[in-house]
Amino acid sequence: MDKETYVSEIKSGLKGLPEGEAMIEEIESHIEHHLFRSFQEGKSEEEAMQTLLQAFGTPTDIVSSFKKIQPVTFRAFLMFHLFCNSALFAVGIAITIMHVWLESPFVQAVWKGISVSVWLILAAYMIYWVLIGYQGVKEFGKRGEKLVLHTILISMVPNVIFMLVFLFNVIPAALFQSLLTPWFVGTCAFATLLFPLFGRMGCYIGRRQLV
């Protein structure tokens, strides 16, 4: 089987599927990269196609694996990360309320622990946005990059709302006095603007892993 026949059978199998064109583009990119690497190693076209079949499977195998991916997966990916980020804010709000209204030693200990770890928490939070990009590309390939950007922009909504609420003093800043220094607030605001960039970094890492 030559390359043209191989690709043609895949195109025929994926024709009409949601995101079918993006799938085909992604597959062709991997095929080209694999063949180029085989030719660099001095293999003939026949040998290169043999290694391609061993690595990727037959066109039927590829079509079957891609048909298992349901469009709802895209929505599930977006909703999962929107839920995760919103849940983090909900937990933060709950801890703040308990800190203000309860005289619990446990709550005070948690608050103190957060107070001395804000920079570490921020670093871990930035890594989370990188992981969104990484996971998106690992799960969906090249077609996942737009999904990652869309997911990040929507998931950022709680962050932007909180930033505006804090800047306009809707919530008294005194409640967070032990947590939020001016320097830390500025860093958080700047980091929020960079969330899409962190996502792109994750996409880049994911693409490198796919190769």
UniProtKB/Swiss-Prot annotation:
<feature type="transmembrane region" description="Helical">
    <location>
        <begin position="77"/>
        <end position="97"/>
    </location>
</feature>
<dbReference type="GO" id="GO:0005886">
    <property type="term" value="C:plasma membrane"/>
</dbReference>
<dbReference type="Pfam" id="PF22564">
    <property type="entry name" value="HAAS"/>
</dbReference>
<feature type="transmembrane region" description="Helical">
    <location>
        <begin position="152"/>
        <end position="172"/>
    </location>
</feature>
<keyword id="KW-1003">Cell membrane</keyword>
<feature type="transmembrane region" description="Helical">
    <location>
        <begin position="179"/>
        <end position="199"/>
    </location>
</feature>
<feature type="transmembrane region" description="Helical">
    <location>
        <begin position="113"/>
        <end position="133"/>
    </location>
</feature>
<dbReference type="InterPro" id="IPR047928">
    <property type="entry name" value="Perm_prefix_1"/>
</dbReference>
<protein>
    <recommendedName>
        <fullName>Uncharacterized protein YwdD</fullName>
    </recommendedName>
</protein>
<keyword id="KW-0812">Transmembrane</keyword>
<keyword id="KW-0472">Membrane</keyword>
<keyword id="KW-1133">Transmembrane helix</keyword>
